[in-house]
């Protein structure tokens, strides 16, 4: 009651925003006479003037009125379109980083030119986001004359472009493209191997068209780049046949090709084993004669040998795994239960499959992924346009910190929205729809019938065919053809069936598309021919208006009121007449699940008979309440997915920041030295624990690992025999000194610049491999974490804790692997260093797949929390996003 009183006194928030912006509209209009007086050259020169003023300290807000007036005048001169006052308000809403709700036909494409031009003045780029490639190309071509007149460049991105073409497109001041393409390019950039491979600039300002579709309907669908996790099965089979020829070393000093470390569950080749496996690989034609397994070009081969050795020496059938239905199934070492669907990483599972002679599965593995929620929140400023956002205003505010401003229509809306008709059965409902369509045909009124699924649209099409009613069907499959059909859906007597999302972005013009008719004329058509086409169109236009405008028929209520409103919004554009009605039945999904009992009891009380409908405001209200419940449920699911994805997103930011930092380095010496010290100290701590007695030490095992894994000869037992008072810290110093000396020899052979490039390649390659494995581990953790709820634990907190532990382990393993490879690989020439980068590029491109996959909805609901847009850069002294409480430089920033 109090809020109602305040609204009456001061107006709603939306009304106050509009009143504030009306003052700016007056300022823009005041500039109009001045702009009209300028020549084309003077008007085009305004852009340079604005850039200079911006560089001299004026803000974009201060330039807004004059810049908007400039765009309006240029639009009139180039396209013959003058922005209405309400379109100026829409442009201001977008510039302020909010969502403009504008009805269908109010010119959203033209509105976007205002904030796009203003923000392009800063030189930092503007991304205009569309729902499909057709709209990206169409809108960029349509609006290009405005931008080019003003001296700005326009780019458009689409999937089939070459790398160079895409780089050029992103350099443009204003770029058009789809949400998928922007997202995939971001992920690909963060898998790039050098800064020159990247295509995107900073994510500065995004204007998202059909923002509800992209930020809400697709919010649960992550973008995924996947690739083949390992090489072909043939290599596994060949290497598997060699391993049984190797002999285990039973005791220290005995002959043998490999040793096993039960404690660490590892198997290591001895010096003799290295020579033996090289001979075997050479005979198998997997290694060139005289070539070392540790040569830079054989890193992947070495990886396969290690996996196969481990599979034979450390993993035993009916203990670590069983073979069932021709598949290797892991046995949980703690519970003894089988774990179907789980697979060991780093090629080990394939090596075990080769050992057991079962089919080797070349699994697709996630290389990189991100949700639209987290991608679009990375932009410095985000805004959006749609015809229907107000019903989702709370979600836009909570998740994206975006306010929805409802923009008034330029002309009053006179569409008649009729009450729903509810039938007992679907058969009755469809019969009523057919009758409505037939009646419209008699009076030549065009009809658009909306369905919730492709299956329903095809079923309705069959019914219309039986009745010999001509019609077109749209299934949102072919966007260009779809736009043509939608453009003609306003012709007299036209009948079009469309799934609710089909044809978004294209207006239905009463009488059909005049532009399409003119475009069909020959290039040398006379003015008389053009005039005849215009007269014919006007006649059709008047005929449709006399018949009542476009008729919208909904065959079922959607789960979201917003989608229903989108369908209704197809009619009544720019003050045109029109009408809409939804036909429902108690057998519809929404009614059956949520509203059937209440509505059915109403129908029984009213004595309804089969074939008779019920039309009552109470019924409509009951249905809308059901939709609200469902919208709330979907919001909770999206919110919960975001809560979980934010954990992965924080880690993604750390990894991508480190990656970018390493790529930008010219010398990686400091990073490698830091890693080496950490790895060597950690190794010593493992075998010679601090604060422990000498009896608990295992110096021989430490010496073996340093020799086998890092090719460092460290006689640790001799040091202890010679000096029993030696301390673990002194052993660390000696081990580190030997590691440095061993590595410095490699540096002296090829020089610091070459070794730096090699180090960078190895770090990036290893980082990518471990990040890929980490994503798989996070996915497995996510799938089972809800079970913690049965133990009275908060699954979300447990997930954060476990994810942090996995992330820390991944970084430790990463450092270990980098130092192991750098220490053991032989580098003789500059070419050896370059071959690693070439291998990495080829491996990354091979079988890379782009996916846009739905996530499971079987997730527990989670508590809500407000999320703000993320900053892109993490400062060295900022808290680490992983949640440890440490500074970034002292935690996960230590790698860079």
Swiss-Prot record:
GO cellular component, one term: plasma membrane
Record-linked SUPFAM superfamilies: Helical scaffold and wing domains of SecA, P-loop containing nucleoside triphosphate hydrolases, Pre-protein crosslinking domain of SecA
Bias type Basic and acidic residues, positions: 866-876
GO MF: ATP binding; metal ion binding; protein-exporting ATPase activity
Binding positions for ATP per the UniProt entry: 87, 105-109, 507
Pfam assignment, any one: SecA_DEAD
Primary location: membrane
Known EC number: 7.4.2.8
Keyword Membrane: yes
Cofactors that this protein relies on: Zn(2+)
Compartments (UniProt record): Cell inner membrane; Cytoplasm
Catalytic activity: ATP + H2O + cellular proteinSide 1 = ADP + phosphate + cellular proteinSide 2
Gene Ontology BP term (one): intracellular protein transmembrane transport
Membrane-protein topology: Peripheral membrane protein
CDD domains on file: DEXDc_SecA (cd17928), SF2_C_secA (cd18803)
NCBIfam families: PRK12904.1 (NF009538), secA (TIGR00963)
Protein name in UniProt: Protein translocase subunit SecA
Gene behind the chain: secA
């Amino acid at each position: 009651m109090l809020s109602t009183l305040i609204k009456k006194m001061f107006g709603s928030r939306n009304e106050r925003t509009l009143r504030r912006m009306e003052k700016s509209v007056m300022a823009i209009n005041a500039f109009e006479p001045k702009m009209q007086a300028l020549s084309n050259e003077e008007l085009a020169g305004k852009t340079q003037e604005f850039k200079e003023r911006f560089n001299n300290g004026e803000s974009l807000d201060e330039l807004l009125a004059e810049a908007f007036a400039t765009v309006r005048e240029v639009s009139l001169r180039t396209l013959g379109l003058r922005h209405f006052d309400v379109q100026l308000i829409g442009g201001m809403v977008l510039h302020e980083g909010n969502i403009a709700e504008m009805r269908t036909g109010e010119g959203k494409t033209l509105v976007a030119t205002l904030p796009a031009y203003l923000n392009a003045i800063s030189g930092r780029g503007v991304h205009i986001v569309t729902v499909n490639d057709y709209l990206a190309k169409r809108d960029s071509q349509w609006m290009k004359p405005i931008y080019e007149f003003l001296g700005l460049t326009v780019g458009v991105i689409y999937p089939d472009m070459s790398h160079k073409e895409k780089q050029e497109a992103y350099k443009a001041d204003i770029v058009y493209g789809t949400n998928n393409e922007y997202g995939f390019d971001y992920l690909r950039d963060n898998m790039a191997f050098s800064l020159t491979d990247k295509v995107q600039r900073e994510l500065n300002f995004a204007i998202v068209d059909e923002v509800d579709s992209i930020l809400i309907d697709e919010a649960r669908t992550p973008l995924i780049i996947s690739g083949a996790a390992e090489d072909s099965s043939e290599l596994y089979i060949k290497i598997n046949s060699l391993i049984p020829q190797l002999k285990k070393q039973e005791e220290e000093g005995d002959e043998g090709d490999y040793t096993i470390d039960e404690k660490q569950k590892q198997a290591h080749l001895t010096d003799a084993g290295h020579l033996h496996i090289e001979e075997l690989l050479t005979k198998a034609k997997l290694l060139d004669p005289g070539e070392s397994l540790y040569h830079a070009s054989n890193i992947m081969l070495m990886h396969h040998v290690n996996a196969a050795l481990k599979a034979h020496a450390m993993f035993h059938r009916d203990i670590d795994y069983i073979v069932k239905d021709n598949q290797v199934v892991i046995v949980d070492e703690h519970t003894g239960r089988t774990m179907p669907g789980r697979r060991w990483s780093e090629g080990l599972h394939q090596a075990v499959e080769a050992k057991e002679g079962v089919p080797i599965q070349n699994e697709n593995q996630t290389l990189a992924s991100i949700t639209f929620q987290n991608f679009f929140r990375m932009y410095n400023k985000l805004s959006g346009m749609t015809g229907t956002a107000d019903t989702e205003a709370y979600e836009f505010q909570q998740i994206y910190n975006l306010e929805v401003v409802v923009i008034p229509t330029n002309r009053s809306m006179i569409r008649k929205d009729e009450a729903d008709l509810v039938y007992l059965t679907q058969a009755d409902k469809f019969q009523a729809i057919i009758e409505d369509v037939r009646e419209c045909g008699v009076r030549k009124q065009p009809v658009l019938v909306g369905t919730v699924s492709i299956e329903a649209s095809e079923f309705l099409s069959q019914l219309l065919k039986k009745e010999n009613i001509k019609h077109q069907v749209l299934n949102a499959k072919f966007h260009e053809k779809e736009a043509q059909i939608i453009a003609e859906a306003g012709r007299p007597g036209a009948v079009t069936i469309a799934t609710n999302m089909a044809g978004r972005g294209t207006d239905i013009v009463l009488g059909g598309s005049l532009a399409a008719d003119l475009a069909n004329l020959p290039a040398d058509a006379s003015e008389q021919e053009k005039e005849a086409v215009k007269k014919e169109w006007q006649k059709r236009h008047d005929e449709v208006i006399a018949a009542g405008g476009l008729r919208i028929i909904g065959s079922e209520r959607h789960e979201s009121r917003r989608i229903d409103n989108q369908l209704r919004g197809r009619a009544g554009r720019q003050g045109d007449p029109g009408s809409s009605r939804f036909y429902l039945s108690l057998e519809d999904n929404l009614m059956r699940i949520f509203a059937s009992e209440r509505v059915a009891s109403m129908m029984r009380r009213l004595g309804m008979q089969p074939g008779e409908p019920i039309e009552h405001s109470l019924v409509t209200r009951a249905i809308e309440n059901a939709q609200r419940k469902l919208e709330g449920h979907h919001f909770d699911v999206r919110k919960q997915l975001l809560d979980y994805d934010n954990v992965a997103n924080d880690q993604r930011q750390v990894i991508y920041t480190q990656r970018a930092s390493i790529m930008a380095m010219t010398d990686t010496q400091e990073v490698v030295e830091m890693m080496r010290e950490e790895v060597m100290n950690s190794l010593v701590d493992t075998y010679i624990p601090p604060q422990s007695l000498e009896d608990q030490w295992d110096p021989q095992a430490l010496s073996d690992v340093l020799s086998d894994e890092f090719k460092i000869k460290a006689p640790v037992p001799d040091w202890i025999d010679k000096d029993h008072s030696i301390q673990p810290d002194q052993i660390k110093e000696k081990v580190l000194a030997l590691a440095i000396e061993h590595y410095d020899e490699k540096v002296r052979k090829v020089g610091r610049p070459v070794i730096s490039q090699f180090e960078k390649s190895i770090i990036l390659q290893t980082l990518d491999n471990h990040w890929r494995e980490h994503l798989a581990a996070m996915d497995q953790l996510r799938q089972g974490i809800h079970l913690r709820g049965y133990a009275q634990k908060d699954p979300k907190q447990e997930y954060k804790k476990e994810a942090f532990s996995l992330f820390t382990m991944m970084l430790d393993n990463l450092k270990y692997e980098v130092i192991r490879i750098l220490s053991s690989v032989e580098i003789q020439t500059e070419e050896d260093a370059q071959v690693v980068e070439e291998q990495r590029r080829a491996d990354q491109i091979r079988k890379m797949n782009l996916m846009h996959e739905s996530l499971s909805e079987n997730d527990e609901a989670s508590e809500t929390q407000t999320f703000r847009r993320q900053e892109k850069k993490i400062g060295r002294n900022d808290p680490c996003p992983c949640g440890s409480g440490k500074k970034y430089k002292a935690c996960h920033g230590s790698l860079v």
